[in-house]
Amino acid sequence: LQASREELVLRLAYLQFTADLRVKFQYNNLMFLTAGYLVEVLNHKSWEDSVRELILEPLDMKRTNFSVLVSEQDKDFARPYLYREKKMEKIPFRQITNTAPAGAINSSVREMSNWVIVHLNGGKFGERQLLVPSTLEDLHLPYMPISQTPPHAYVSPASYALGWFVDYYRGHQRVYHGGNIDGFSALVSLLPQEGYGF
């Protein structure tokens, strides 16, 4: 039996702290689940319906979905593979319905580029203003340092913003976030001041 989103969020009250608030960076997908559940409570509809209406439809992301079962019906979908014992092996899709806000969006490079455009174009897609510029600034603003040691000579120590990692490469701000699930990896990376994204 899988717990519902509400049950998972309510159980977080029993999660023991491993560090005080804002003392140590700790990435936790359950917080994305919590944010998704809050969207459901405030909008009186599922997280999926809210994302579809507020993001996917305005961005013309018609093939993007929340279920691997839907993805499998698409004429052009990717299959998950795992490199094991020196060979590529096809593995089953992993469906994460109850924790969908933490990583169940299935998309394509073409459709994800529309999401990137919004972040590089001051919140606009075509003629439609989806986010006000100050909201984008808030999303990309570092709130929590991750480390004090730079990973490379040309990259600053990273921080975490609102759903984005932020660092500086040779003085250029980089805003990025990856996602992984069995057989798949993805990365969205932006250089907002330069207007580049992939």
Language-model features, listed with the residues they occupy:
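Active-site periphery "cap/insert" segments of enzyme catalytic domains
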Residues: 198
